[in-house]
Amino acid sequence: MSVDKIELPNYKLKHELWNSITHGLGAIFGIIALFLMLLKVCGIYPNNDVIYDKEFIYKIIGVSIYGFGIITCMTISCLYHALAKNNGKRVFRVIDHDFVFVLVACTYTIFCLGSIREESMWNGLVPYSGWIIFVIVWALIALGITMNSINIKKYAVLSMIIYICAGWTIIFASDILFTKLTLSGFLLLLGGGIAFSIGAILYGIGKKKSVWWHTVFHIFVLIGIILQFFSVYFFVL
């Protein structure tokens, strides 16, 4: 799809200002979150001894990917909404949608590598559940990014379906996650997923009625990110 054929929403300056601010705040939160997670994993806090073994390495990798996902997704969204209407904004619209998928995959990565990597789900029937979920989610995300990049308008519905399916793949490992995260951690993870889904559904239903629904979507994304960060920080690391 050629760049000049990519349609841009008819947002006014005040709408784009709020869209940019909300995810600009998300980018700042992502930087702080990554810093705090690295501090915790590396054991810089007093009386927190770190064993530099395989578990430590996987958590460092998982945290780095997770933090990267939050920061880049929020930053790209902020920049996209801040740009004037030109071909640059059209390109960033596609990238912005792509990185929503990336955020989902990066969030899964820390849970898969840091919590359930070698655990068995379904009462021990399926070993290495973390790796299986990891591969499935990244495969779905790759498909979603491909479809979205080929034609953002033509495959909009398919992309949304893939986004929701990828986001809820975690239900297949809900039994082991509930055990590993405890009730509080699991509810934070679940709450984040619900926030993402509600935001996407409300935006899909309301976008033709009011452009403010996109800002509402941004707010729900921020809520989802914050809830899942708490799940990671307190119950995975």
Q: What role is predicted for each listed range?
A:
Residues M1-L237:
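Multi-pass alpha-helical transmembrane bundles in non-GPCR membrane proteins
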